[in-house]
Amino acid sequence: MTENIRQIQVSNHVMMQEISRMFTLGKESVTITVRGYSMRPFLEDRRDKVVITPPETPQIGEVVLARIAPERYALHRVIKKENDSYIMQGDGNPLYMTERFTQADIIGMARTFIRKGKPHQTTDFTWRCYSFVWRMLKPFRRILLGIYRRLP
């Protein structure tokens, strides 16, 4: 039996307001489709999905959905905490491309990645190892991503 799923497209701002409202009303998670290439090689544009849960205090290495400017949002990895703010960066972004946000800017936490149709919990040992290794390869990412983009 096939489930009827209705998809709609709305602006990011409208979607983030709705996700925040749903969490306020007690919804435990929301699944969104990835748009963009900033989280390559882990997440691919329009192919992969992310299960977002209500906001918590993020740890270094966790992926959060946050407002980074008025009506601008990003799903990126937390790389640093500075005083009352956090610094985030997309896994596929150049080293100089970072965004700053505060706890109040967090829309939600990425807890499950659905990659090529297969769910991966962010708490899984394998996923945590991949994330750790990728963070350690920061100086070589540009080269590695160049190779990755050329793969069939």
Predicted regions and their residues:
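Acidic/glycine-rich C-terminal interaction modules and beta/coil loop segments
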Residues: 56-57, 67-152
